[in-house]
Amino acid sequence: MPKTDVSGLSQLGTKVDLPQSPEEAVLERVPSGHEGTDFVVRFTAPEFTSLCPMTGQPDFAHIVIDYVPDGWLVESKSLKLFLHSFRNHGAFHEDCTVDIAKRLVSLLSPKWLRIGAYWYPRGGIPIDVFWQTGNPPEGVWLPDQGVPTYRGRG
């Protein structure tokens, strides 16, 4: 089994300050090492935070990202820092969700990617945002994202 080349990574294994914005955040990638094999990678961020662009109040979401690599994997520490960079970023739920997905697609050029963002209610209305690049490759196992529909107290 070949060892993954991590020589080009700038954040893994070092102390890194949190980026102040998504634009400042550096996403990094590593070779998958499994060319020709379709598999699904899932990242779950159950405590994602951003700010409402109108009120500055915090917004919270449970985000699930699934993708089928085509040669590249996102380096998980850089993804964590990228997602954390939204903490002080003002944007609507839809913008945060789609921007995250498009940034990953730009970095990785995956065979397929989907994101589900399950935003916690503000003003009594939950907003769920879903985006994907197209149909997944045939034959890959795609488990349910596992986030229950918001039911309130009823």
From Swiss-Prot:
One of its GO terms (molecular function) is preQ1 synthase activity. Its EC number is 1.7.1.13. It catalyses: 7-aminomethyl-7-carbaguanine + 2 NADP(+) = 7-cyano-7-deazaguanine + 2 NADPH + 3 H(+). Substrate binds at V74, E75, S76, H93, E94. It is found in: Cytoplasm. GO terms for cellular component: cytoplasm. Pathway: tRNA modification; tRNA-queuosine biosynthesis. The keyword tRNA processing does not apply. InterPro entries: GTP-CH-I_C/QueF, NADPH_dep_7-cyano-7-deazaG_red, QueF, QueF_type1. Pfam families: QueF. Residues 1-24 are annotated as: Disordered. One of its GO terms (biological process) is queuosine biosynthetic process. It comes from the Bacteria. Keywords: Cytoplasm, NADP, Oxidoreductase, Queuosine biosynthesis. Catalyzes the NADPH-dependent reduction of 7-cyano-7-deazaguanine (preQ0) to 7-aminomethyl-7-deazaguanine (preQ1). NCBIfam families: QueF-II (TIGR03139). HAMAP family: QueF_type1 (MF_00818). Belongs to the GTP cyclohydrolase I family. QueF type 1 subfamily. This is NADPH-dependent 7-cyano-7-deazaguanine reductase. It comes from Sinorhizobium fredii (strain NBRC 101917 / NGR234).
